[in-house]
A protein has these predicted regions:
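Short helix-capping/linker turns of helical repeat alpha-solenoids
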Residues: 2-4, 9, 22-26, 38-40, ...
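Terminal, low-structured helical/coil segments at or just beyond the last alpha-helical repeat
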Residues: 98-141
């Protein structure tokens, strides 16, 4: 990816990330998500990016949680959802990821009272379950 000792080749990097991600490597899934999100070494594919970030997020990769929130906020591969963006940013904040608090403060100002109540309810449900069970119950993907 960075060309350490070899020429930079995003296509080759994508191939290696893909192989490693398919073996369950969390950081490779995060890198794969970025590749799909940005179109680096592969055509942009928001749904595949979300799938890769989801894998990493469910295994407590904090930046993946932040990016999933961003995707819901911007409608990248999903319908824009302030409640889901708030939820994922809150889950990222729980892992002390920079930017999550600012995003939460920003989106709170844009949310209706009903949206905010639903988002808080979803967050509390996730705190009472494993994140995997929470995502299944709330159909978050």
């Amino acid at each position: 990816k960075k060309g350490l000792g070899v020429p930079v080749n995003n296509n080759e990097a994508f191939g290696w990330f893909f192989l490693s991600a398919n073996q369950g490597n969390i950081l490779a899934n995060y890198a794969l998500g970025h590749a799909y999100l940005k179109g680096s070494g592969i055509k942009k594919n928001y749904k595949s990016a979300l799938k890769a970030f989801k894998y990493a997020a469910l295994r407590e990769h904090p930046s993946s949680r932040l990016i999933i929130g961003n995707m819901y906020y911007q409608g990248q591969g999903v319908i824009v959802s302030y409640t889901r963006a708030f939820l994922w940013w809150s889950l990222a904040q729980d892992l002390n990821i920079g930017g999550a608090s600012q995003n939460i403060d920003m989106i709170k100002k844009k949310m209706s009272k009903d949206q905010y109540s639903k988002a808080k309810e979803m967050y509390l449900m996730c705190m009472q379950n494993t994140l995997y069970n929470c995502t299944k119950k709330l159909d978050l993907f």
